[in-house]
């Protein structure tokens, strides 16, 4: 049966999502992707502000793939039966990769970043996984919508428990959840679900050398990403439990 759903790839930064994004774009064709490459190029090779991406959704109703560094709550703007995809990465590794990204872009220096970690401060936004999955819908339009969403990715978290609970519930609602350390399984799952001929790729490697962090510095990264660590472990545990259930059902050993 032909797959005719639209796809939303909630691309959380530094999760190896660029490789999947490019594979999906190749499979559906550039003309069926929002935000378009033209709009991305207009913004210097970066995803455009949210309100511009949503406007392009309205202008291209025949799109097949919507992807970007946008919160999962943006799904409310998409058709009800949209297929949702998310990739999670070990939160400590993801945060360190984000720091290297900041260094490569010149947003900070290595000396300043390491000093921040030594002093117990994280030089990048904390708990990105929970922010993207558990962030509350923003009721605004136009540039205000984009500005408030941008703020939501870095401002202090007001209610950690509430954010974590929403992230867990959202994670359970994702149609296809993958993990950076098992990308082949994710590609296989997407291909099975959509029939799209995906090609494994390795794109957008870090442009900054690996960092050698002390135990103290690593502890700072962990401490500031406790919500993400809990979310990551919970999602992996549920994935493994579901895999075991499917295996038992196939072997006839499953009992309700």
What residue spans do the PLM features occupy?
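A generic hydrophobic-helix recognition signal that picks specific residues
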Residues: 7-9, 83, 221
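Short, conserved catalytic/metal-binding motifs centered on acidic residues
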Residues: 16, 90, 228
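PAPS-dependent sulfotransferases, especially Golgi type II membrane carbohydrate sulfotransferases
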Residues: 171-183, 187-188, 192-256
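General alpha-helical segment detector with a strong preference for membrane-spanning helices
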Residues: 18-20, 94, 232
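PAPS-dependent sulfotransferase catalytic domain
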Residues: 41-87, 92-198
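A generic structural motif
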Residues: 34-41, 95, 200-210
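PAPS-dependent sulfotransferase catalytic core
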Residues: 1-62, 98, 106
């Amino acid at each position: 049966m032909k797959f005719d759903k639209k796809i939303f790839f909630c691309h959380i930064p530094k999760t190896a999502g660029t490789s999947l994004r490019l594979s999906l774009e190749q499979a559906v064709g550039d003309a069926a992707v929002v935000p378009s490459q033209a709009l991305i190029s207009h913004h210097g090779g970066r995803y455009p502000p949210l309100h511009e991406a949503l406007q392009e959704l309205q202008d291209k109703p025949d799109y097949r793939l919507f992807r970007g560094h946008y919160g999962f709550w943006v799904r409310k703007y998409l058709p009800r039966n949209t297929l949702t995809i998310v990739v999670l990465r070990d939160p400590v590794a993801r945060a360190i990769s984000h720091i290297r990204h900041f260094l490569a872009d010149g947003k900070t220096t290595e000396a300043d970043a390491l000093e921040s970690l030594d002093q117990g401060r994280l030089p990048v936004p904390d708990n990105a996984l929970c922010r993207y999955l558990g962030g509350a819908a923003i009721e605004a339009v136009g540039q205000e919508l984009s500005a408030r969403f941008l703020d939501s990715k870095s401002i202090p978290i007001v209610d950690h428990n509430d954010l974590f609970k929403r992230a867990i519930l959202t994670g359970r609602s994702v149609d296809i959840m993958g993990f950076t350390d098992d990308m082949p399984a994710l590609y296989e799952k997407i291909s099975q679900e959509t029939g799209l001929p995906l090609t494994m790729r390795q794109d957008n490697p870090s442009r900054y050398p690996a960092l050698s962090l002390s135990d103290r510095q690593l502890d700072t990264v962990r401490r500031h990403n406790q919500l993400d660590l809990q979310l990551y472990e919970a999602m992996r545990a549920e994935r493994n439990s579901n895999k075991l259930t499917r295996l038992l059902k196939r072997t006839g050993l499953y009992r309700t």
